Structures are given as C-alpha cells and as structure tokens.
Curated annotation (Swiss-Prot):
<dbReference type="GO" id="GO:0006935">
    <property type="term" value="P:chemotaxis"/>
</dbReference>
<protein>
    <recommendedName>
        <fullName>Protein-glutamate methylesterase/protein-glutamine glutaminase 1</fullName>
        <ecNumber>3.1.1.61</ecNumber>
        <ecNumber>3.5.1.44</ecNumber>
    </recommendedName>
</protein>
<keyword id="KW-0597">Phosphoprotein</keyword>
<keyword id="KW-0378">Hydrolase</keyword>
<dbReference type="InterPro" id="IPR011006">
    <property type="entry name" value="CheY-like_superfamily"/>
</dbReference>
<dbReference type="InterPro" id="IPR008248">
    <property type="entry name" value="CheB-like"/>
</dbReference>
<dbReference type="InterPro" id="IPR001789">
    <property type="entry name" value="Sig_transdc_resp-reg_receiver"/>
</dbReference>
<feature type="modified residue" description="4-aspartylphosphate">
    <location>
        <position position="55"/>
    </location>
</feature>
<dbReference type="GO" id="GO:0005737">
    <property type="term" value="C:cytoplasm"/>
</dbReference>
<dbReference type="InterPro" id="IPR035909">
    <property type="entry name" value="CheB_C"/>
</dbReference>
<feature type="active site">
    <location>
        <position position="181"/>
    </location>
</feature>
<keyword id="KW-0963">Cytoplasm</keyword>
<dbReference type="InterPro" id="IPR000673">
    <property type="entry name" value="Sig_transdc_resp-reg_Me-estase"/>
</dbReference>
<comment type="similarity">
    <text>Belongs to the CheB family.</text>
</comment>
<comment type="function">
    <text>Involved in chemotaxis. Part of a chemotaxis signal transduction system that modulates chemotaxis in response to various stimuli. Catalyzes the demethylation of specific methylglutamate residues introduced into the chemoreceptors (methyl-accepting chemotaxis proteins or MCP) by CheR. Also mediates the irreversible deamidation of specific glutamine residues to glutamic acid.</text>
</comment>
<keyword id="KW-0145">Chemotaxis</keyword>
<dbReference type="GO" id="GO:0000156">
    <property type="term" value="F:phosphorelay response regulator activity"/>
</dbReference>
Length: 359
C-alpha cells in the first residue's frame, strides 16, 4: 500500500524537486504540492495525506502554526523541511516539540542539487514517518534506485575497538548513556527534566543534523535541573551534567584517571548514522563496564543494538523503551533481539528509574 504525501513549501524549486523525487518511489504517492498552509488546507479537505513535508517560514501562515492546527485536528506524521540557520534550528525544535517526527535540512543556496543528492535519504524519511504512532507523539508532547542495496553499514569497529574484557574500572562512579532517534526529541524533553541535579553524568546520542544539536541542548537546559550542553572534547561527565552528541560527529566517553570525559570526533557513518548510538554505547562499555546504565529509546533502524549488547556483556544495566510508549519501536526491538536488554520499560518508568540513581 502506497504512502500518500503532501508537500507544503513556498519555494517552487523545492516543491518541484521533492514532487519528482518522491513520485519516483513506487510506494509513495504525491497528492500535491502547496505553496502555503492555506492552499494545503484546501487540498486536505479533498483527501488527507499519510505524511506531510512542511516548510517552516511561509507567507500567510507559518509552518509551526499550521503544524499545531494539524495536531489538534488530526495528528499526522509531519517532516519539517528546514533551513540550516540558527533561527531555523530554534523554530524546528519548537516544531519537533509540537509533534513533528523528523527533520530534512536544506541549504539557502543550491537547493535543487542538495535535494537530488539526498534523494534516497528523503524517500526513506517519508517511509519511516508513515510508520510513526501519532497517538504516542501527541501524548509525549503534551506530557529500482530506492530498492537498490543500501550503502554498506559500518560497525563501531571503524571508530574504536570492541571491548576486550580486560578493562580496569577504576571507580564506582556511575554513568548513564542514552540513544534514540525518531520521536526521541519529545522523549528526551519528557525524560531529562525528571532527573535531579544529583543524578550521574548522562551522555546522549539523538540522531539529528548538525547545527540543530546545540539549539536542542540549549532548549533542554532551560527545562532541566541538570546542566545540558552540546558535548565538546574534554567535557567532564559528572553528576548533574548531560552532554548531547553534536550533529555530524561521534560522541565517545573515555577515562581521564578516575573521571569520565567526552571525546568528540569525526569518522564514517556507523550503523548509517553520525553520531551513532553504537559508538557511544561501545565506548561506555569499554570505560565504565558495570558502572554504566544504558537506555535505548524510540527510533527507526538498529543503531545501538550491538552497542547495547556490548554494554550488557560488560556488566552494565541495560534498558529498552517498551513498544506502547515508543513513536517507532525499531531501535529498542533490535536491541532486544540482539539479547542485550535486561529490562523493558515505559518512558515514564525509565524516567522514574533514572531519577532514583545517584551519581
């Protein structure tokens, strides 16, 4: 069964390229391309789409206002098509908090070439969005070429060696590692504000484009009792601090004596992502072993499944979010299937469990 899509963007170039690109996928039907939300609402009265690709800054009605109307009337998976600017990042994060499920970034210049180059990724974003459970999104917010073999999926081996079993854990200080993707921004905005300032240091990988993670960390910092910031190499992971992996970079945790410190580095995509949950989890397995708590939450794909198994084998406590509270039960399901999960919990229970751990 095909996925029906409505494109809403005031750029004629973006509308044209997205329409051509998505129409070329045999399982996607483009219902139309509207220059603003007013035209879009007229089209949606005729037939409601399965997925909406939505620009933010448009005439007559901005995308954020339109998104909120959609979520009030009939919650629908929305992919935000946002510019790579600081202002665009802030507004896009507001859109994710309001219920959007994913972000597509577009440059200010050469948009046609950029979108054509990213065709496979964008088509897959639409397919993934169609699987999102919008009832869960709303609840959390309120409290051929496309079928060609995928690009080689690298493992965390390309960034750091697997745990040897010979590591020395020279401290009893605890650390929390969290990995998430689709639906994760809403889940993190629910979970992290529940943590007290006395909780262990937290390292987070949220699949998100570069230039967005700094704004996301700032947003979380305003909501939380713990200090939240985008990770930089050398940052200490201490009690009451949460570090967010920068978009486009891998986040590792290493030891500096008895302390945990962040190591932010370039590298190839791992499990098709950068930052990769597998990389973070492996690094925590190596440096913290049984002193770590690993949490894998809502998201598409299998990033983190192998790393969580490595954390489990190193003695860490490992937790997966349950299907009912996930927007997409992909990453947690894969982690469970890999045998690396000790406990399966709702998002609410995960927050309660982590809030009870002291650094």
């Amino acid at each position: 069964m095909s996925v029906s899509v409505l494109i809403v963007d005031d750029s004629a170039v973006v509308r044209e390229v997205l329409s051509q690109m998505l129409s070329s996928a045999p399982d996607i039907e483009v219902l139309g391309a509207a220059p603003d939300p007013i035209f879009a609402m007229t089209r949606m009265k005729q037939r409601w789409p399965d997925v909406i690709v939505l620009d933010i800054e448009m005439p007559r009605m901005d995308g954020l206002t339109f998104l909120r109307k959609i979520m009030d009337e009939r919650p629908t998976p929305v992919i935000i098509c946002s510019s790579l600017t600081e202002k665009g990042a802030r507004i896009t994060l507001d859109a994710l908090a309001a219920g959007a499920v994913a972000i597509i970034t577009k440059p200010a210049l050469n948009q046609r070439a950029f979108l054509l180059e990213a065709a496979k990724e964008l088509v897959q974003e639409v397919r993934d969005a169609a699987r999102a459970k919008m009832g869960v999104v709303k609840r959390i917010s309120q409290g051929a070429a496309e079928h060609a073999p995928p690009a080689p999926k690298l493992t965390a081996d390309v960034v750091l060696e697997a745990p040897s079993g010979l590591e020395k854990y020279r401290t009893t200080e605890k650390i929390i590692a969290i990995g998430t993707s689709t639906g994760g921004t809403q889940a993190l905005e629910y979970l992290l504000p529940k943590l007290p300032a006395t909780c262990p240091g937290v390292a987070v990988v949220q699949h998100m484009p570069e230039k967005f993670t700094a704004s996301f960390a700032e947003r979380l910092n305003r909501l939380c009792r713990v200090e939240v910031k985008e990770a930089q190499t050398g940052d200490r992971l201490i009690s009451g601090v949460a570090l967010i992996a920068p978009g486009g970079k891998h986040l590792l945790v290493k030891r500096n004596g008895a302390q945990y410190v962040a190591d932010v580095k370039d590298g190839p995509l791992v499990s098709r992502h950068r930052p990769s949950v597998d990389v973070l989890f492996r690094s925590v397995a190596v440096c913290a072993g049984g002193n770590a708590i690993g949490v894998i939450m809502t998201g598409m794909g299998d990033d983190g499944a192998r790393g969580m198994r490595e954390m489990h084998d190193a003695g860490a406590r490992t937790v997966a979010q349950d299907e009912e509270s996930c927007v997409v039960f992909g990453m947690p399901a894969e982690a469970i299937n890999h045998g690396g999960v000790d406990e399966v919990m709702s998002l609410e229970r995960i927050a309660h469990m982590l809030a009870g751990i002291r650094g």
